[in-house]
Amino acid sequence: MTDTRDDTPADDEPGSDTPGLACVLDFNANDPSGSGGLTGDVLAMGSVGAHSLPVVTGSYARDTSGIHDFYAFDEDAVGEQARTIAEDVPVQVIKVGFLGSPENIALIAELADDYDGVPVVAYMPNLSWWEDEKIDDYLDAFRELMLPQTSVLVGHHSTLRRWLLPDWEGERYPSPRDIARAASEQGVPYVLVTGVPLPEQHIDNVLATPETVVVHEKFERIEAVFAGAGDTLSAALAALLATGMDLPEATREALVYLDRCLDEGFRPGMGQVIPDRLFWAQPEEAEHEEDGEPEGSLSPGNDYFEVPFNETKH
């Protein structure tokens, strides 16, 4: 018998006209350990109320102790993934993680330029595991091609200062504003600098422009070696911007989310600690019961983070 059913959703069916979750076009590598990469991005974005559109740029060969090798995808494969989904789904924010090769950087920078007006959150990881020549080629391409498309550059203080200010000769370390000034020479308006050392076992995390400090949040240093913290933070920031939160508030919320992820971190193998991006989904501890909190009082997404929907402001 002929099947005459129409697969097109009716107007009154769920999902037919509802806006749904804000979507982030997410470029990053596969990480088999789940420490970072696309796995971490998807979990972090979902936890704060956005939907990741993950585009695989390659794959690490790694365990929880460290990265042993990387296999980059061909730029044609990366481009086909991105264009196919972007032609179907409206994109609120583009998130850039590790792209794997100068060729992929060139392609993704061109794509970001085609989406003029869509914010780009770019994260620069520590690349010390890689070969020196590949590091230099990658950083040069990222500086020349990707930074001019970047709205917010995210990275650890030591990583960004060595990259953007290699000839720094001051008696003090460069400040976040110094780093922001260097990034602004390539067109980056905001830099989120993490891990700025402070006295008494604290660290500062600073959203800065060349002219001013926009946000700074101090946290107590956690005595553990983590993998995936930078991916978690940049993914959460991109997702919160996609939902409509303005940049200063999104930065604060992303930092608080990261702190909770690290505080609840776990060690699945013999190496580093992994952020628990789903801390809110774990069973309530006895201490919460003693405090009189009802079971299940901590929940994810827009209600928890009080995120207005889809009104991104820079």
What is each stretch, according to the model?
Residues 133-214:
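Conserved phosphate/ATP/ADP-binding segment of small-molecule kinases
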Residues 27-33, 214-227:
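Short pre-catalytic strand/loop immediately N-terminal to key active-site residues, enriched for Gly-Thr
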Residues 2-26, 40-129, 280-284:
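Conserved N-terminal subdomain of the carbohydrate kinase-like
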Residues 21, 72, 248-314:
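Charged C-terminal helix
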Residues 49-53, 213-214, 240-254:
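Phosphate-handling active-site elements
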Residues 162, 224-247, 251:
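Short, small-residue alpha-helix embedded
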Residues 29-36, 47-48, 52, 63-77, ...:
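Active-site-adjacent loop and "lid" segments of alpha/beta metabolic enzymes
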